Structure formats: structure tokens, C-alpha cells
């Protein structure tokens, strides 16, 4: 899912897809920011492995995967 050598074009496509498929661009941006903040604190707490992927990049990838593959979500 998350590669150490992140492709910037792929990341841009994922971000555009999130925005394009949302009904509210502002709320999507807030979701990305909130998820990035959570990941940043998880990194501080040592819950996540060391990664060269920045929290915002990780958030975009995770939200994009959740949008594209909803059957992976629990519940």
C-alpha cells in the first residue's frame, strides 16, 4: 500500500480523485488534514513504524484506498 519511494504523480491522481468524487471539497480537505494529524501523533507515540512518507501523503493514500475499496473497511 505505502511505498518508500512515493510516486508524486500517483499521489496527485489520488488527491484529485478524492476531491472529484466528494460532494464537499472543504470537508474532504478537512478529513485529509485530520487524518494526517492523527498519523503524526501516532508517529510520535511510536505506534507506526519509521517511514519516509509524510503524514499528509499517508492520509491521502489511506483515504483514497478506503474510497476505492470500501469492502476493506470493517463493519
UniProtKB/Swiss-Prot annotation:
Q: Which InterPro entries match?
A: DNA-dir_RNA_pol_omega, Pol_omega/Rpo6/RPB6
The protein's matches in Pfam families, at most eight in alphabetical order, are given as: RNA_pol_Rpb6
Q: Which GO terms describe its molecular function?
A: DNA binding; DNA-directed RNA polymerase activity
Q: Name one GO biological process term.
A: DNA-templated transcription
Q: What is the catalytic activity of this protein? A: RNA(n) + a ribonucleoside 5'-triphosphate = RNA(n+1) + diphosphate
* Taxonomy, superkingdom: Bacteria
Gene Ontology cellular-component annotations:
DNA-directed RNA polymerase complex
Which EC number(s) does UniProt give?
A: 2.7.7.6
Please provide the record's keywords in A-Z order: DNA-directed RNA polymerase, Nucleotidyltransferase, Transcription, Transferase
The main enzyme category here is transferase
Role, per record: Promotes RNA polymerase assembly. Latches the N- and C-terminal regions of the beta' subunit thereby facilitating its interaction with the beta and alpha subunits.
Which family, according to the similarity comment?
A: Belongs to the RNA polymerase subunit omega family.
Query: What name does the UniProt record give this protein?
Result: DNA-directed RNA polymerase subunit omega
Amino acid at each position: 500500500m505505502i511505498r518508500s519511494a512515493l510516486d508524486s504523480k500517483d499521489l496527485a491522481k489520488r488527491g484529485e480523485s478524492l476531491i472529484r468524487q466528494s460532494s464537499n471539497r472543504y470537508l474532504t480537505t478537512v478529513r485529509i488534514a485530520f487524518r494526517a494529524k492523527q498519523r503524526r501523533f501516532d508517529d510520535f507515540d511510536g505506534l507506526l513504524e519509521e517511514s519516509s512518507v509524510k503524514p499528509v501523503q499517508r492520509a491521502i493514500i489511506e483515504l483514497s484506498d478506503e474510497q476505492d475499496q470500501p469492502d476493506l473497511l470493517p463493519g
